Amino acid sequence: YHKKSGIIAVLVPTVEIPFFAELVHNIEAELYNEGFKIMLCNTDKAHNAELEYLDMLNRHIVDGVITGVHSLDVEEYKKIKKPIVAFDRYLGENIPVVAVDHKEGGRLAAEILLKNGCKKIVHFRGSTAVESPYHERHFEFARIMKEQGVECFDYELAWNKFDLEYYKYAVKDLFDRL
């Protein structure tokens, strides 16, 4: 028998990025309404932080995990026999994924750029190193741009890099390539 902690760990790379800050804010509000508290886990500063947080789940410190980080191999998640919810990455057939309609997002982005007469586009895309629903957005965007004859330069961002220095490097690298 194990007494529930009433705590859900929310794993994100960093709350310095507005997307993750807003996501955590909304997750916390919804979980609070259901009688849970969150333990916020920023993982970008420590190499093995994600694994340590999953270990907390196994040791009954938290009742479940909502994860938006994906530095671990999918096999690590498959070992966990407690509630896990992922967003924007498939972690296994028994782990639910929350994702947006990425194909529609790609279509909308392409339509807006085309409507505004854009002819040469730099397309920053997520890493293809992992299977993720966000690839659908990029494929749809690229498909539409190609059909419309718009020149599109794809720039693949490194996997799991969220710091400002990396983005400065990426922009410099992009201009060196163009």
Specify the residue positions occupied by each region the protein language model found:
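Residues that line or immediately flank small-molecule/substrate-binding pockets and catalytic motifs
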Residues: 12, 69, 125
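Residues that form or flank phosphate/diphosphate-binding pockets in enzymes
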Residues: 18, 48, 132
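Central regulatory/effector-binding core of bacterial HTH transcription factors
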Residues: 29-74
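Generic recognition of short, well-ordered alpha-helical segments
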Residues: 21-23, 52, 135-136, 169
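Short acidic/polar active-site loop segments enriched in Thr and Asp
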Residues: 6, 63, 118-121
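Short, glycine/serine-rich, charged loops/turns that create anion-binding
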Residues: 4, 15-16, 45, 72, ...
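N-terminal helix-turn-helix/winged-helix DNA-binding helices
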Residues: 1-25, 34-36, 44, 56-59
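Bacterial carbohydrate/catabolite-sensing allosteric modules
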Residues: 29-34, 58, 79-86, 91-178
